[in-house]
Amino acid sequence: MLQLVNDNGVVVNAILWLFVLFFVLVISITFVQLINLCFTCHRLCNNVVYKPVGKVYGVYKSYMRIQPLTSDIIQV
């Protein structure tokens, strides 16, 4: 009908490949951002939860440490 250039679908093929490459790029960026979010959450939990709980556990451990009895109390 009104065909100006016989390109045998090269333009359509190129446009489809650009869409595929754009989609792969978006998926890759999303994956990198997800990994970055995981590292950020881990850092936040490390500073907010893990370190204070570790310090409280250290205080609890030192509080619960029992001194051994002296030898004059124990009669063997």
From Swiss-Prot:
The keyword Transmembrane applies. Bat coronavirus 512/2005 is highly similar to porcine epidemic diarrhea virus (PEDV). Belongs to the alphacoronaviruses E protein family. HAMAP family: ALPHA_CORONA_E. Residues 1-14 are virion surface. Homopentamer. Interacts with membrane protein M in the budding compartment of the host cell, which is located between endoplasmic reticulum and the Golgi complex. Interacts with Nucleoprotein. Pfam families: CoV_E. It comes from the Viruses. InterPro entries: E_protein_aCoV, E_protein_CoV. Plays a central role in virus morphogenesis and assembly. Acts as a viroporin and self-assembles in host membranes forming pentameric protein-lipid pores that allow ion transport. Also plays a role in the induction of apoptosis. It is a single-pass type III membrane protein. It is found in: Host Golgi apparatus membrane. The keyword Membrane applies. This is Envelope small membrane protein. GO terms for biological process: disruption of cellular anatomical structure in another organism; viral budding from Golgi membrane. The chain crosses the membrane at residues 15-35. One of its GO terms (cellular component) is membrane. Keywords: Apoptosis, Host Golgi apparatus, Host membrane, Membrane, Transmembrane, Transmembrane helix. Residues 36-76 are intravirion.
